Amino acid sequence: MQSSMTMELRPSGDSGSSDVDAEISDGFSPLDTSHRDVADEGSLLRRAEMYQDYMKQVPIPTNRGSLIPFTSWVGLSISMKQLYGQPLHYLTNVLLQRWDQSRFGTDSEEQRLDSIIHPTKAEATIWLVEEIHRLTPSHLHMALLWRSDPMYHSFIDPIFPEK
């Protein structure tokens, strides 16, 4: 079977440009993927709801007080996950990464973070933020965030608390 390819040239939508947009067609109509988008959306909503419901069930550790040395927020969170055997919420992981990124270009960028912020205060801050993230976000908000971030899985911890 022989397929004919056509290319349609049309002026670019930018009126100040002399560029031309090209659309290539193989002569077949595009597949209707709207049903897949709706199914994916429903699946994402269900996953977000299950995730948020699960995170609400995980208790914040009460026996804390270890002095954990750390050079970055993400590094501290990794140590906390190992020490307490608990996951941190997606939103907490994203926030901690952003806090680390916010140090880029500062005078203290190369300085150990535990020499700037006392380890006990830093850990308490993470647990306070974690409690907010476990108890308050809606699964609808989570699904919207996940839909906009194709790599959202990388911020979801695979650690499950031991009971």
UniProtKB/Swiss-Prot annotation:
Consequence of gene disruption: Impaired accumulation of siRNAs, reduced DNA methylation, and loss of transcriptional gene silencing at RdDM target loci. Impaired RNA polymerase V-chromatin associations (Pol V).
Pfam family, one: RdDM_RDM1
Gene Ontology CC terms, in alphabetical order: nucleoplasm; nucleus; RNA polymerase V complex
Subcellular location: Nucleus, Nucleoplasm
GO MF term (any one): DNA binding
Primary localization class, coarse: nucleus
InterPro entries, alphabetized: RDM1_plant, RDM1_sf
Keyword Nucleus recorded: yes
GO BP: gene silencing by siRNA-directed DNA methylation; siRNA processing
Protein origin, superkingdom: Eukaryota
Keywords: DNA-binding, Nucleus
Region: Disordered, residue numbers: 1-36
Its job: Regulator of RNA-directed DNA methylation (RdDM). Binds to single-stranded methyl DNA. Involved in the assembly of RNA polymerase V (Pol V) transcription initiation or elongation complexes at the chromatin, as a component of the DDR complex.
Subunit structure: Homodimer. Interacts with AGO4, RPB205 and DRM2. Part of the chromatin-remodeling complex (DDR complex) that contains at least DRD1, DMS3 and RDM1. The DDR complex recruits/activates the RNA polymerases V and acts during siRNA-directed DNA methylation (RdDM).
PANTHER family in the cross-refs: PROTEIN RDM1
Name this polypeptide is given: Protein RDM1
Organism the protein comes from: Arabidopsis thaliana
Name of the gene: RDM1
